[in-house]
Structure formats: structure tokens, C-alpha cells
Amino acid sequence: MKPLTPRQAEVLELIKVNMSETGMPPTRAEIAQKLGFKSANAAEEHLKALAKKGVIEIMPGTSRGIRLLIEEEAVLEETGLPLIGKVAAGEPILAQEHIESHYQVDPALFHPRADFLLRVQGMSMKNIGILDGDLLAVHKTQEVRNGQVVVARLDEDVTVKRFQRKGSQVWLLPENEELEPIAVDLSCQQLTIEGLAVGVIRNADWM
């Protein structure tokens, strides 16, 4: 794709957002109104420029005749949330090779805003409704407080547990009375907090 001007990028982003939220592209008048153009004709000129660069196709005869030509996956990558698969030791959790797919889920549905999804494995957090196969929405941060549910990496394992720390001692607490807490001594073990759990997308098999 040829480089876009800042204004063209704004128009393209508006088209993507409108299609994501409503299922339809915006009209020329809507583009003009939302981006502050003086007229729908100004919006039309930007659309023609995007078409010339191979980003969209203009369909004649309809006010919403705009079709995205960029790959659907590219749209998902920009508007959805990545699903993280198996994580290699020593690699950033959001490294491209860890991303299995993208889900068309609005990150702003969660507070704080979600940065990625992680598929839950096992029933260690079942007492608070986080079940095997669920998708856990995660806000990427290393700043967490005692009592919060976190995504932590210990050696090569990524786990979801409730966080508790006192000095150099950390306990990763399950929400399942059949399992024992994981004790971590930060003076001799490396623990990485990958993020804070901010929501759950239920596995349909449980419903």
C-alpha cells in the first residue's frame, strides 16, 4: 500500500470504525461532518485518492458505495484484540509469533482498556467464574496491587492467579480450594507480571 497523507489516514480510519460499529461504510456527508470538511465533495476527493492508492474501491450509484480492499485480517489487527497462544521463554508476550488470531472485540469495553486476550487453561480460578477455555481480557501493565487477578510469567509458564506480595515474597493464589498457592521468592526467582485481568469472554461450551 502506498503511504497515506495524515488526512487520508483519518478518512480510512473513519471508514474502518464505521464498518466495525455499524456494518456499513459512512456516506460522503457523514465523512465531511465528522472530519470537518466544508462539503461532501471534499470527502469525495479524499475517497478518490484512497481508491487511486488501492486502499478502497468506490462503487458508483450509492451513497455508501465504499469497499475496503485491504485484507480483512489487517482491519482486525487494527480494531480488535490479539489472542495470545503459547509464549516462548524470554520473548515479549505480544511478540508477533505468539499471536494466534485476532478477535473483533472493542478494547474499550473493558476498564482499564484491554490490550490482548489469553485463553484460560485449567480450573484454578473457577470460584470467581474464570473457567477452562474462556478468553481472559488483559490490560498490559506491571503495576498491580495485592488482591488483583494478574497474568504472571514464571520461568516458561504463564498463569492466571490472584496476586499477593510481602517484601520479596510473592504468592500466586488460585481460586480453587483443591489447588495450592504458588510461592515465589523474588531474591532468587524471576517473576514477570504481564498484565491485569479486566474481563472474561465466556467459552460457549459452558452455556
Curated annotation (Swiss-Prot):
Instruction: Decide whether keyword Repressor is in the record.
Output: yes
Family, as annotated: Belongs to the peptidase S24 family.
Q: Which InterPro entries match?
A: LexA, LexA-like, LexA/Signal_pep-like_sf, LexA_DNA-bd_dom, LexA_repressor, Peptidase_S24_LexA, Peptidase_S24_S26A/B/C, WH-like_DNA-bd_sf
Which BP terms does GO give this entry? DNA repair; DNA replication; negative regulation of DNA-templated transcription; proteolysis; SOS response
Q: How does it assemble?
A: Homodimer.
Q: Where is the active site?
A: 124, 161
Enumerate the UniProt keywords alphabetically.
Autocatalytic cleavage, DNA damage, DNA repair, DNA replication, DNA-binding, Hydrolase, Repressor, SOS response, Transcription, Transcription regulation
Tell me the organism.
Aeromonas salmonicida (strain A449)
Question: What's the domain of life for this entry?
Answer: Bacteria
Q: Does the keyword Cell wall biogenesis/degradation apply?
A: no
Any idea what this protein is called? LexA repressor
Q: One short Pfam family name for this protein?
A: LexA_DNA_bind
Gene Ontology terms for molecular function: DNA binding; serine-type endopeptidase activity
* Function comment: Represses a number of genes involved in the response to DNA damage (SOS response), including recA and lexA. In the presence of single-stranded DNA, RecA interacts with LexA causing an autocatalytic cleavage which disrupts the DNA-binding part of LexA, leading to derepression of the SOS regulon and eventually DNA repair.
Q: Site Cleavage: list residues.
A: 89-90
Looking at the UniProt feature table, which residue ranges are given for the DNA-binding region?
28-48
| EC number(s) per entry | 3.4.21.88
Q: Which reaction does it catalyse?
A: Hydrolysis of Ala-|-Gly bond in repressor LexA
Broad EC category: hydrolase
